[in-house]
Amino acid sequence: TPNGADALRRAIAQHLYRFRGISAAPEQIVVGAGTEYLYNLIVQLLGREAVYGVEDPGYSKAARIYALGGARTAPVLVDEGGVSLRSLEMSDAQILHTSPNHQFPTGAVTPIGRRQSLLRWAEAREGRYIIEDDYDSEFRFTLRPIPTLQSIDRAGRVIYVNTFSRTLAPSPRISYM
């Protein structure tokens, strides 16, 4: 199918449930050649009119991809607990791109209380979503994993994105959402 091979999507669904606590049907999973491709799909899905909040400092390539897709971006400051709620609320972002499990470049891990606050932010207004970029989350050796935003989202406001480029090999560029 255009969303990825059925067997691969089934395997990803099992992996997500077992290791990240995410319950997703294989039909809900989209496989792509790299996260850049998936970010472009997200802009097509959620719209170019929306303002995409990106972490500052953060993965600058995401902001460039959103801008190339015709979307406007807004910087959202990061502190020792990840995305600053105050900065997010002061921005005009409708969609937040965040890496709560291992923020780049700070390495901050967003605590569960702030994750719940981020979900409340998304639920507070129609058209708000969170793109959870879980890149590099498999490499947590000292701390117990905190639940992903997607696994505790009850309102369907989180789009989970990850890749196998760090765990398998960088060459295949297999990413999924």
Put a short name on every predicted segment:
Residues T1-Y129, S137-I159:
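Conserved core of the PLP fold type I
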